């Protein structure tokens, strides 16, 4: 990392082959001065691939500038709230925000936002990530890269995962109104056991189908 130079990138790739390593991952990390996914970045990727082809090693791309994978070095989450990670909390206290969900009993719920990561439950977010990161690599290098390393994609752990796609998805899966059931995710009332099982099944399906599967299919 720091400021990349193709000659130094080739030297490092060659050294890894010399000591018996079968390949390497091209991973942007803290301290990188070269613009990630810019022309100079790809010049260095080309240099590393060329050296791997000479040495018979494997050149793998890492799909993010840091981790967890999915935010596209800030370009995906930078598109706004629709693309940013969201979560629900249940807390006693005064009103904190105007971003409100109200259930049929008049209980107010508020979702909070992590602006530094993305909503991995919404497929449009994943397709934008693929467009900004995966497709430029393929356009430039085709099958000369062995594959991609994707690291720690995740749902929110700050509260219960939330996404704007959830109410409609829950309705389609269970024929029920999720907004009316939100209190059951936090308190042992109503059909809370069933609601929680359904909720986490939905979260699992959304993450698998809307984040992991599009990347796998690509």
Predicted regions mapped to residue ranges:
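Mature extracytoplasmic enzyme cores
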Residues: 8-19, 37-211
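N-terminal-proximal low-complexity accessory segments that begin disordered
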Residues: 1-34
């Amino acid at each position: 990392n720091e400021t990349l130079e193709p000659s130094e990138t080739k030297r490092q790739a060659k050294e890894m082959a010399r000591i018996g390593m079968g390949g390497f991952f091209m991973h942007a990390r803290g301290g990188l001065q070269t613009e990630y996914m810019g022309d100079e970045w790809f010049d260095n990727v080309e240099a590393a691939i060329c050296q791997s082809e000479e040495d018979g090693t494997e050149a793998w791309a890492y799909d993010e500038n840091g981790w967890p994978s999915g935010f596209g070095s800030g370009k995906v989450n930078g598109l706004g709230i629709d693309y940013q990670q969201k979560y629900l909390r249940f807390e006693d206290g005064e009103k904190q925000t105007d971003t409100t969900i109200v259930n049929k009993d008049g209980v107010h719920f508020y979702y909070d936002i992590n602006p530094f990561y993305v909503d991995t439950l919404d497929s449009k977010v994943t397709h934008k990530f693929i467009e900004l990161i995966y497709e430029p690599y393929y356009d430039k290098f085709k099958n000369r890269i062995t594959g991609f390393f994707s690291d720690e994609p995740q749902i929110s752990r700050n509260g219960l995962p939330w996404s704007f796609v959830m109410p409609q998805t829950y309705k389609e899966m269970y024929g029920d109104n999720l907004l009316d059931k939100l209190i059951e995710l936090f308190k042992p009332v109503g059909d809370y056991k069933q609601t929680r099982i359904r909720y986490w099944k939905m979260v699992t399906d959304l993450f698998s189908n809307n984040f992991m599967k599009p990347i796998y299919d690509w």
